[in-house]
Amino acid sequence: MQGSIMCDISSVSSNKKDIINANTYLGIELGSTRIKGALINGQYQVIAEGSYKWENKLENGLWTYDLSDAWHGIQSVFSQISNQINKDYQLRLNNIGGIGISAMMHGYLAFDNRNKLLVPFRTWRNTNTHDAHRILSSELNLNIPERWSIAHLYQCALDEEEHVHNVAFFTTLSGYIHWKLTGKKVLGLSDASGMFPMDSNSLSWDENALNKIENLPEISNQPWNLKDILPTPLSAGEFAGRLTVDGASLLDPSGILNPGIPFVPPEGDAATGMVATNTLKPGTGNVSAGTSIFATVVLKSPLSKAHKELDIVMTPDGHLSAMSHANNFTTDLNAWVNLFAQFADAIRKPISMDLLYTSLFNSAVDNGTEYDAGGNINYCFSSGEFQAGLEEGRFVFARSPQAKLSLGNFMRAQLYGAFCPVTIGMNVLTKEEHVEIDSLLGHGGIFATPEVSQRIASAAFGVPVTTMPTASEGGSWGMAILASYIRRKNITLIDFLQNEVFAHVNSVTVFPRKDDVEGFQRYFEQFMRSLPIEHAAIATMP
């Protein structure tokens, strides 16, 4: 099982049989920078995949994506998969055993009773919802993060935006795509728990929270009831509709794909990360690192109280988990790597990006590199960061006169700085709530460089960090696995993953090193002390 599978001759016959018999499962995930798709066979191996780059943009002070670009990307991804099946197996991909859609969690997509989008898609990245976060968290005695969909809706009501009276339905990005493909207004448990608080017993919306919010004046004077405009939560493996005729045309304008294919509940990227890393059991957790970063730990028991640094969300099968989320991670890091690439081009010594990333990352753990990055500090904030108390962000690299500026120290400062914001919430979980974490599993592109990012992450969190062959391609594959779970009866999702999907998967574990852990702690303390630098940059740089 790997994220990028080149099928050998012996597997072609088996894969052909699976394609003909619709024993294949498709997962499509809309990430922050790429839309990716993975088609798996009956043995949970990827037999075709596709990807499409897209970018968020800042419009009228709010981060958004163009939904027409989302559909163009989805169609491109499916076309790549369909063409690969035709090329490799001389078959038309006209039927699939199950489909699942996943996407970035949270955000705000609101529609009127004619299914018209009322305002441009507002993503998880927006931090204009601080007042809503503060009021809702106080009213519910729960942490309602700025990213959550209910915070977006309530902020719109607080701001008296004209569209609020006309809301007939609101959802997340995965919920929207699923709705357009199937006609069903549903959402998987994990993605739902990033919209609005969930009841872990009923596996539905928290009725007490619904009643409290309904009684807030800004909501009580609306012509709608909150419960009526939310999607219906569904557990992993539940039937969530079929591909409609219109949906088939949206997904595959060529007309090859047949309607009627069953769908599983749409999910968020936290859920697909848990599935792709087999971290659904209490005491396990995963770190998903990309444009943003979040660490999710499945809880053995509820936390003692609400913490503003931690989201309480669900696994796709309904277990409570705690999430520390940071809005910023690789944007600044990628910009620095691109600068080195430009230098290589300037001296007419071009280098592949894979080799460049590997070389730069390895320098961060070279023998001559100081464990605390030698007095160099980096703030990777391209946007606001709740964990650090920032409503906006600026990129800042700073060093003391005594700092040793070497390539290794510079790169370690970059990597440490990227992990610092998420560590704020993780420290609350481990040091205040005393949650014991057995291990974390890393996934996302940054973990594609063998062991380096694991070593940095293990220094930040103080626990072993494991990666598997799917480390850099987890989301769409994880959603395809959830799609395949629709065929399984009388087996829990945890057992399905443990005993079938991951029964023979290799992994690499890096254990924390004392010098790294102590070095990161010194860096982290300086990072927190020097945050006024970031505030000054925000105040003085447009």
Label each PLM-derived region with a short phrase.
Residues 1-119, 134, 166, 227, ...:
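N-terminal glycine/serine-rich phosphate-binding loop of ATP-dependent small-molecule kinases
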Residues 7, 12-20, 26-27, 93, ...:
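Active-site core segments that coordinate phosphate-bearing ligands/cofactors
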Residues 52-54, 123, 512:
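Active-site donor-binding loop signature of nucleotide-sugar glycosyltransferases
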Residues 54-64, 136, 189-192, 224-230, ...:
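Gly-rich Lys/Arg/Thr-decorated short loops/hinges at beta-loop-alpha junctions or inter-strand turns
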Residues 85-123, 143-145, 178-199, 230-243:
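Short beta-strand-loop/turn "lid" adjacent to the catalytic site in phosphate-handling enzymes
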Residues 126:
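Carbohydrate-associated surface elements
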Residues 129:
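Gly/Ser-rich phosphate-binding catalytic loop and adjacent alpha/beta segment
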Residues 214-234:
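A conserved helix-loop-beta module that forms one wall/lid of the active-site cleft
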